[in-house]
Amino acid sequence: MKDSRGKRRCLAFLKGLRLKTDPNLPGAKQKTPFNISRFWLLVIIVIYTATSACIYFDWSAIRNLLLTVGKYKHLNVGDYPDITLSPQYKRINSLYPITLAIHFTMSVFCGFLYDHIGPKFTAIIGQMCNIMSWVFLSIDSTTVDTTFLSFVFLGLGADTAFIPILTISNLYPDASTFILTVVGAAASLSYAVPATLNFICRRYPSTPFPYICYGYIFLILVPCLLVATFLLPLMPFKGLDYYIERDQSRRSGAEGDAHRGRRGDPKMVTSQTNDEVDVEMQPFENAQSEASKGRSGNGSNTPSTRGNTPNGGKQTRGKTTSESNRSSKGEGSAIQGVEEEDQATNSSKGVNEEDSDFHRKSISLFFKVLLSYPSICIIVYFILFNISTVFYGMVTDTYFSYDRSIINIINILMPISCIPCIIFGRFINRYGSAIIIILMNAFSALMHLTALIKHRAAGLVSAFLYMCVTSIYTSQIYCFIQNSFPSVVFGKLLGFASLCGGLFSLLCEKLYDQIVSKDGASIDPTNVVLLLVIAFILMFLPLTVLYFRKYERSIEDLHQEVAMSQSSGRA
């Protein structure tokens, strides 16, 4: 009896995880370039991402490729029994934190470009940087450090080509966070690119490395550039919060008109200009009940223009809000950004006026959001997470010097990390990303501790945890930001979080110097690992607060709430 009950509960849980998307939602019907269906656009973007995203995140494979083709070999003055102690190895390893720092520093500029000039031109800039990167890598020179220049451009192009495609998630408004992790899973597949090129170099040693580089440029990067040019929109697709705000504003306006009609009062009861912005960080737990009362309680009230003028139109002077419905206890959403949009016109004058106002408002809102608790907490977490992951990638050869086969297993696991990424994405779409962030915090500590145990079983556990951590490397941050903050500042906030993570990753080079003995004969990462583990343990407290205060909205619960409110409105 108990077994059958448990089985039914398990089946009910699995059925609850089944994802259904509604193609009739307003966001799903947005116009796409060449009217391509949202499904085929997603397929093309997945291929685009899998072949040209952050390929250097599997640093072990990149390092092996550079060693195979002899980059920096001229730095070695003799033979080294342990390659990890050679100047060539150290120089190649130093490229990782530098590239990551450039990558994430560029992210903040990419975020502004995404929000203000749109995904198309941002992605074009990114792919041009990627092409330049491989052009420089194909050049073998000892007078000019072309390898360093190559990784500079690789860092510049990584997020600049990747972040713009995240706008595809807005075409799936009831599954947006899951789509973000699907794209993140495709990025995990891109980890196979350096391993594949390394295999080609080893299999066909007579093939000059520049030929391989140009083959990658013309077969992969040029088609990706064409995708960015023709299939990405000029302005980001509008998010779910835009349509919720518009619908609730209209219903609130209709209710207000009816109320005034009964009282015979032709004037507005209350109005608020678009210049007044109130940003209030509060838990999301009461947002849905507020939404059902007619207030915009979707967790990010600012219209999801993501850089475009709201609805491309002109706002009316008397924009009403439902502030009167706010309870005295301060119930609210994660971000109370009071900005709304009304009737659209096609006049270019209206668009230009709104453009000017939008940029000023968006930047002002960004700085207010930046100082909120969830923003600070998630940025601090990402800094620690980034340092941990980069350091692990730099010392894999040291961790597993007793069994090199584990490193080969890591190279295999990295591309297939797309599988746990999709699984995590499904849970994020249903339960929010905060719980997954807490899980990744635990995994990050455990992967270092198990790596210190010189045993094959512990090493395999560490490799598996590393795969899980890297599978959702930045997707966890993307999803939290999308669920918790106004989508109008998505690019800027994401870019700033990446900037902080990237700059602090430069500490990894100093940490690596600390674990090398003074005579350069041995490497012991134990002290640094213990420091990282203590930091992760301390991080559990603010992350737990973040989870229980419910700063982020559940996409699926919100969609159900919207559907109910729309049906009641029609009734």
UniProtKB/Swiss-Prot annotation:
The keyword Transport applies. It catalyses: L-arginine(in) = L-arginine(out). GO terms for cellular component: membrane. Its main location: membrane. It is a multi-pass membrane protein. The chain crosses the membrane at residues 39-59, 94-114, 117-137, 148-168, 177-197, 217-237, 365-385, 405-425, 433-453, 461-481, 488-508, 528-548. SUPFAM superfamilies: MFS general substrate transporter (SSF103473). Glycans are attached at residues 35, 298, 325, 346, 386. It is found in: Membrane. Keywords: Amino-acid transport, Glycoprotein, Membrane, Transmembrane, Transmembrane helix, Transport. Active at pH 6.5-8.5. Belongs to the SLC43A transporter (TC 2.A.1.44) family. Sodium-independent cationic amino acid transporter. Transports L-arginine, L-lysine, L-histidine and L-ornithine. This is Cationic amino acid transporter 8.
